[in-house]
Amino acid sequence: MGTSPRSIETRHRLPASIEDLYKRKVQRSKTKDVEKPFHLSIQDRSSRCKFSFLKLILLVTISATFVMLLYSPEVYNTSHLSGSGARWIWGGSDPRYISNIDTDWDDILKITEKMIGKNEFQGIGLVNFNNTEISNWKHNFHDATHVVLHLEHAANNVTWESLYPEWIDEEEETEVPVCPSLPSLVSPGTRLNLIAVKLPCRNGDNWSRDVARLHLQFAAAGLATSFKGNYPVYVLFITNCFPIPNLFTCKELIGHEGNVWLYRPNLSVLREKVQLPVGSCELALPMRGKELVYNGNAPREAYATILHSAHVYVCGAIAAAQSIRMSGSSRDLVILVDETISEYHKSGLEAAGWKVRKIQRIRNPKAEKDAYNEWNYSKFRLWQLTDYDKIIFIDADLLILRNIDFLFGMPEITATGNNATLFNSGVMVVEPSNCTFQLLMDHINEIESYNGGDQGYLNEIFTWWHRIPRHMNFLKHFWIGDEEEKKQMKTTLFGAEPPILYVLHYLGLKPWLCFRDYDCNWNADIFHEFASDVAHAKWWKVHDAMPELLHQFCLLQSKQKAQLEWDRRQAEIANYTDGHWRIKVKDHRLNKCIDNLCNWKSMLRHWGESNWTDNEFFTPTPPTVATSSLSAL
């Protein structure tokens, strides 16, 4: 007793507008390696001059050394790589790129013979293998042409933090964000239909955020898409850790044995992916310009959200649906609900336009019992919506102010930045796939989430993601360090008509759990950073546009009314200077009772006592909304 549904996930305290406080700019220096040609000149000698015996020995030694280098497997064969001179495979030892795992040739042969037939490979490109492994490739696939591909290593100052900075200047006020350069593989003059790459996999929790590992996979993808013609190109990785799941997808995985992964990528789709920035160091979509337009395949695209263990978000989901329709989108709306959501509440969701699908909850094995994050891995069920090609997931506590259908044209995972190198999962593009769902489930016992929730877990799986402007998931939040000018700028964005923001994400206490008269975040000091009367009024404007039939799903329980009054009294005692505690509440919901203890004021006499339970505040379940009454919607 004495607590309200105010649990806030960690992500809600980490707004996309990180730049307002930190403004960390990554200094990038461009380095260019200059190769100095190795010249070996022998001057003509006069017919009258004779070499001494010592000079003759020296000449023979140099010649023998040159011949050995020329035929060494460590260098390029110029007949295999047009326009390229002899180069070393490693270009010098770089520990970032070295992989010490053993190559299991039985697994390689098993996969290639079963899935393709090893004799089908006319040309095999080899990346990041040592001399012994190259010899084994030639021995096991002796009918193929083998090309040893050289990849210049990334500069030492290219770090994961420079590829995925916490903040970039999206508005280009002081600089144009530019990603660090990662060298590409040069397309050889011969046809390749298999590109084999050996990937490093560091020990430790952060193995998936590895510049060399990303570089090798991105380079392989770029080379695969560079070939002309309508023939398949296979990509084979040797690694103990799974490859980037949204660059080379599990739907394209045709064979996996041990540490061998064989893909047949969709080259058209992959070609679009490699055109995107390599990290979140640049926007994947423009900040400004003409209104973004996307047609796509509407029947195979949907907005989706999820409700589990909390009917208090039903009102928020209904308002979110209303905002999507007001933005002009006609895409399907799909909501996943568990068994805790009553038939009454499901009928309200359906009346609002949501296609309701019941799911079985997924427990977070690392969460405490009854904790806020105990069941939030249920979000993984989104990947089982395989009757859709693309999903735009939205949290149930936001409003769509402008049409964002164009995000259906973006790949998985497209999202706004959160903090550090991470994305905010409150709005994200998902590509449903049963095998991706299985990937998520396979690792829930081993992968640690930074915030204990689904957002942290997804950030460990999908480390390669695409940044969109924060206006597409703008958090209702003011940093303590925000100057008044910055606060006023945000307030202007919250209330702008026509809207400037695409999405407004309501953090802190939710608008429908406050009285509509003002934002109740003002009455608790720990929530002041989320308080905005302008944003609050914006939400209620959408609420009032909903069919009146749906307003009943936003009524307040008696316990919540008591909580709001308790917080107001505490604000009065503390004499908060904003003065919201002085405002007389006129919200008509104050006098509407939906449970069996309507005298909420009497609850305040015992507020906070530990021997109280919620049992006596049982809320009767009203009858479902009749579908016959929906004709007016």
Residue ranges of predicted features:
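Conserved beta-strand termini and adjacent loop/short-helix elements that scaffold enzyme active sites
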Residues: L149-L151, I238, L336-D338, R357-R361, ...
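Short, acidic, metal-binding catalytic loop of nucleotide-sugar glycosyltransferases
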Residues: S323-R331
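GT-A fold catalytic core of metal-dependent nucleotide-sugar glycosyltransferases
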Residues: E343, E350-A367, A371-N434
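A glycosyltransferase accessory/donor-loop signature
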Residues: G2-Y313, A319, I444-L633
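Glycosyltransferase specificity loop/lid
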Residues: H80, V337-K346
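Hydrophobic/aromatic residues located in beta-strands of well-ordered beta-sheets
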Residues: V235, L333-V334
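Amphipathic alpha-helical interface elements that mediate macromolecular binding in regulatory proteins
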Residues: A219, C315-I318, Q322, S347, ...
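Short active-site oxyanion
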Residues: R331-L333, D389-K390
